[in-house]
Amino acid sequence: MANEINHEFWRAFRHAVRAVKEDIFLIGEIWEEAGIWLQGDQFDSTMNYDFRKHCRRFFGEQTADAGEFDSRMTDMRMRYRKQTVYAQLNLLDSHDVSRFRSLCRDEESFRLAVIFQMTFPGMPSVFYGDEVGLTGILEEEYRQPMPWDTLDESSPLFLLYQKAITLRKKEAVLRRGEYRTLLAEPGSRVYGYERYLEKEDGSIESIRIFLNMEEENVPLPEELLGGEILWQEGLKEGQLAAKGFALIRARD
């Protein structure tokens, strides 16, 4: 835990390691608000446990609606400078917390959390075993070894991770684009947002993402659906199925 050592040490540590390797990237394990460690003289990034906490309430425990989830995510983004937000290590799991899959009621909810993680500003962190749905509440459970002998690279969850990572690598807008909320009504569990990026020619590239955490099909606003469907599960005739998602490249 980086906060258990004083700031003077980390400033000296940064100076020492940068003298050896100028482009080294330092990530600190900080569980609380990390602004004081991210002033450019200590760490370049921190493990974003707030990201996990808010995702846990929306996708896992389902105690937050879309409005609250968006409000907390907005507060988290506004807390730091833009370059810091885009460098934060966004995690669902780590070596110190119960497996996120165990906190979700079903695999479908976990899948939506993964889609959100891979399309949110920052650096998505995949802890070993996330891609195969490892579970565990207690320390001896969530730190269990990787089940190499039973690893199924054709499982739906493994393929979801592969496709989400491939899409993020391919689409610069998902890595560098701005973030804008589209749907986040209080009392609703349907969340929609947009990643958009101005290109060199002045045009705007945009990908809209919709996640339905409701237990029933919901209609999406027609004006938000125009464009090329990049990836979808459960989108049909303007209706998004329960626990479905859609990624749409918006028309210019």
PLM features: what roles do these ranges have?
Residues M213-L225:
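Surface-exposed beta-strand/loop patches in extracellular or lumenal glycoproteins
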Residues G40-S45, Y86-D93, S98-E108, V114-E153:
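Aromatic/acidic polysaccharide-binding cleft in carbohydrate-active enzymes
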Residues E223-G234:
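Solvent-exposed beta-hairpin/edge-strand motifs
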Residues M1-Q83, F116, T135-K163, E216:
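Active-site-proximal helices and loops of the catalytic beta/alpha 8
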Residues F127-Y128, T135-L138, Y142-I207:
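Glycan-recognition and catalytic regions of carbohydrate-active enzymes
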Residues A16, D23-F25, A87-L89, M123-V126, ...:
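Beta-sheet entry/capping signal
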Residues K236-D252:
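C-terminal beta-strand-rich structural cap/linker in extracellular carbohydrate-active enzymes
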